Every structure is written in C-alpha cells, then in structure tokens.
Design a protein with these regions (language model features):
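Structural preference for beta-strand elements that scaffold enzyme active sites
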Residues: 36-38, 68-70, 93-97, 120-124, ...
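A general structural detector for well-ordered alpha-helical segments in enzyme core domains, enriched
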Residues: 53-60, 109-112, 162-166
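Histidine/lysine/aspartate-rich catalytic loop segments that bind and position anionic ligands
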Residues: 98-106, 111-144, 149
Length: 230
C-alpha cells in the first residue's frame, strides 16, 4: 500500500496501493476472496509519514472483509492513535505482528501490544540481534511467534541458540513457533555462515524446529503470495 521496494526508509505510495479493491472488467475483484494480503512488508504500517493514507487502508480492509490483512510494526505505541473509529475490539480480518529485535524492545513494546484491542496478534522476533526472554508475554492472546535473523551484507549475526531459546519458551507456553529465516550471518555450533538471501528461508525450514505450525497458525510470507501496496 505504501513504502518502497527499493528503500524501506522511504515512504511513498506504490502502484499497488489500492490492489485489494481493484476490479476486473467483469466487476469481480482482482484479489480473490480468501486471499492473504501482506501489508507494508517493506516498510512499517504505522509510519507517521503515512498517516494521511492510512484511513484509505483501513477502509480497504473493511471493504474486503473476505480477505485477511497482515502487517508488522515496531511502532506499536502509535497504534491506538491510528485506529479507525469503528475498530472496536479489532477487525476480524486483520492480523498485527509486533516486532522485537532485542530485550529492550520486547520489554517496551510487548506490554503495549498485549493491552491493545487486536483480534489476531503475533510476535515477530526479527531481526533477532540478541538472546531475548519473552516468556512472560506469551499469553493466550499470542497466536504465533516467528523468529528471523537480519538480512543484507551489513547484517548482524543471528545465533541459532537464540532461536532455540525462543522455541523452548513457546513450547513451555504452548504457543506456535516458526523459524522463518536464518538471516545473512548465521552462527551455529561455533561457526558463522554467510547465507544468501534466496536460501535463508529454505535453510531455516531445514532445521525442522517449527512448533504447532499448520493450517490454524498465523500465515507466513512467501514469494507466491502477492503483496498489496508497499
């Protein structure tokens, strides 16, 4: 909807801003009912620079109640001031993922996240740059925890032991856990590996450590799923 495919810090509308409500010549939606729409995955849905456009985004989500919309944010402390008037206890078709990269971020953002009226909540431990303990935040509200390392040539190292620690916390609380991607620099068994971007998801899946991830768990972004907007 907005953001940039080139630079994630640049906030602008993309050509796909209104993709969820675009129609074909026969009047049917181009985005089929039941689709999962990943929203602002190259940016942040709650950027202040995008405030003027967000009303239209909420309206599209409401209009397309036959689709699920999923966005991540590290600005969860802005959500309450950005919600539409008819939000109530949340739109049933909107999933919100709160990102945390270290313990400081987790301890600040997650209490706010848990206090907000959201129907579907996930925690995104990404880019994971240190070992974190989120066990006290793993309430029944949390539908999934997903963990990923950092991508890019200047990416910081992600230690596999940090991933395993998060997994253990989730298992103890019976919260679904997904190891989404390794990141570019991945430390395992005392050795640091450089993993090309195109292999990071596949390498994470090879670890085989996902817990209770299935049809009822929060969806993952894949190359086959069309991004809406930004």
């Amino acid at each position: 909807m907005y953001g940039s495919e080139i630079l994630s810090s640049e906030c602008r509308k993309t050509g796909n801003f209104n993709l969820p409500v675009k129609k074909k010549r026969d009047g049917s939606y181009k985005t089929e009912p039941g689709s999962l729409v990943f929203t602002c995955f190259t940016s942040d849905f709650l950027l202040a620079d995008a405030d003027e456009w967000r009303k239209d985004c909420w309206q599209m989500m409401k209009q397309r109640s036959d689709c699920m919309f999923y966005f991540f944010t590290k600005r969860i402390d802005r959500l309450s001031q950005c919600l539409p008037k008819d939000w109530g206890d949340g739109y049933e078709n909107v999933i919100v993922g709160c990102t945390v990269e270290n313990q400081k971020a987790a301890d600040y953002r997650l209490p706010i996240f848990l206090s907000l009226p959201i129907k579907h909540k996930t925690i995104i431990a990404a880019p994971l740059i240190e070992k974190i303990d989120i066990s006290k935040y793993l309430s029944p509200q949390i539908e999934e925890v997903a963990a990923s390392g950092e991508s890019g040539m200047s990416a910081r190292v992600c230690d596999y032991n940090w991933i395993l620690s998060l997994r253990a916390q989730c298992i103890e609380k019976d919260v679904p856990f997904c190891f989404h991607q390794t990141g570019a620099h991945f430390l395992k068994d005392g050795k640091t590996y450089f993993v090309k971007r195109k292999y990071q998801i596949a390498q994470a899946k090879k670890a085989g450590i996902d817990y209770k991830i299935g049809a009822d768990s929060a969806p993952e972004q894949t190359e086959e799923i069309r991004l809406a907007g930004f």
